[in-house]
């Protein structure tokens, strides 16, 4: 039996926060494919007509996508180290994103907004000399 992969988030209930937005952002990779397996075992795929790396991400923590929005590339790598996602082939996942197109994380507007908030908050709450 051939495994079923979802290519769209329409009609899919109870998706992790920010998954839909991130999935839409990576819909047109330059090459290769990426399968994202959610904690509830649903599998979504994005693929290009061009050959390339075929990545597979197993999401273990549904807050992974929120972390991507907040922290961008750092959130992606640190969440891997924290065990929030796994893969049978890390090199293929990295190659997919390398070939996916320039600035894939640049579209994460929330990353810049959250960074601005964090810096502002830090400066506003610094202890002052009395």
Q: Residue locations for each model-derived region?
A:
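Short amphipathic beta-strand/extended segments with alternating polar/hydrophobic composition
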Residues: 44-50, 58
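Accessory substrate-recognition/RNA-binding modules or partner subunits associated with SAM-dependent
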Residues: 53-117
